[in-house]
């Protein structure tokens, strides 16, 4: 196998979610995160964009989405891209 870089968009449950605390919770529970930033969406809502490196296993995308769904304050997780590292 190899490694893949995954770009994710994390949507909080509401505009009232403390994004700094949510980022800290994500870093505490998920390994392999290379970059994380807040991106304004509109109407007072922001998303968290994450770049992470993980093993290229079958079903890796589903595993990643499942991992983030267990963190309180997250409404949904979208994988924007998944690319194999050379």
From Swiss-Prot:
<protein>
    <recommendedName>
        <fullName>Elongation factor 1-beta</fullName>
    </recommendedName>
</protein>
<comment type="function">
    <text>Promotes the exchange of GDP for GTP in EF-1-alpha/GDP, thus allowing the regeneration of EF-1-alpha/GTP that could then be used to form the ternary complex EF-1-alpha/GTP/AAtRNA.</text>
</comment>
<keyword id="KW-0251">Elongation factor</keyword>
<dbReference type="GO" id="GO:0003746">
    <property type="term" value="F:translation elongation factor activity"/>
</dbReference>
<keyword id="KW-0648">Protein biosynthesis</keyword>
<dbReference type="InterPro" id="IPR014038">
    <property type="entry name" value="EF1B_bsu/dsu_GNE"/>
</dbReference>
<dbReference type="InterPro" id="IPR014717">
    <property type="entry name" value="Transl_elong_EF1B/ribsomal_bS6"/>
</dbReference>
<dbReference type="InterPro" id="IPR036219">
    <property type="entry name" value="eEF-1beta-like_sf"/>
</dbReference>
<comment type="similarity">
    <text>Belongs to the EF-1-beta/EF-1-delta family.</text>
</comment>
<dbReference type="InterPro" id="IPR004542">
    <property type="entry name" value="Transl_elong_EF1B_B_arc"/>
</dbReference>
<dbReference type="Pfam" id="PF00736">
    <property type="entry name" value="EF1_GNE"/>
</dbReference>
